[in-house]
């Protein structure tokens, strides 16, 4: 009992944890885990300042979540694994971008696009309203023209659709015989008398 207690007594990272969760392998990892944590913060803050986004509240939340992540990584590892966090993850990527709750994540490009749209939209909408502002008479004329054009189109389509039926329309009561059954173009009119013959 005395050995694990003495080993972890001076370890800053394990102060708030119960003794059950403390692992003796964590002693060598604590310094290496803190380095990428600090680097990730500075990279993330530098990017935000360069972009000029007001993100003070978001920075505070990110820092808190990063510290929690650093502690939880040490807890979840089995005793057999001795890899430090800096070897497992490349240092080129900022730590904040690796693990973040899905609800908090908003892509930066999408933010920029929506911001641009809201800045320009009031001016554009006023111009559009002025252009669209027509008198009621003009509106009625336009609507009338459109409806007339649609009616004409319908009539043309109906008339065009019946061109192939004109032969049958001319003599609707003519005897049909086997025309519909054969499927021959022209209805098989040349063989009208064949259906009267009982045997061929």
UniProtKB/Swiss-Prot annotation:
This is Transcription elongation factor A protein-like 6. Disulfide bonds: none annotated. Belongs to the TFS-II family. TFA subfamily. May be involved in transcriptional regulation. Its main location: nucleus. It is found in: Nucleus. It comes from Homo sapiens (Human). The modification Phosphoserine is found at residues 30, 65. InterPro entries: TF_A-like/BEX. Residues 37-52, 60-80, 115-154 have a biased composition (Basic and acidic residues). Keywords: Nucleus, Phosphoprotein, Transcription, Transcription regulation. It comes from the Eukaryota.
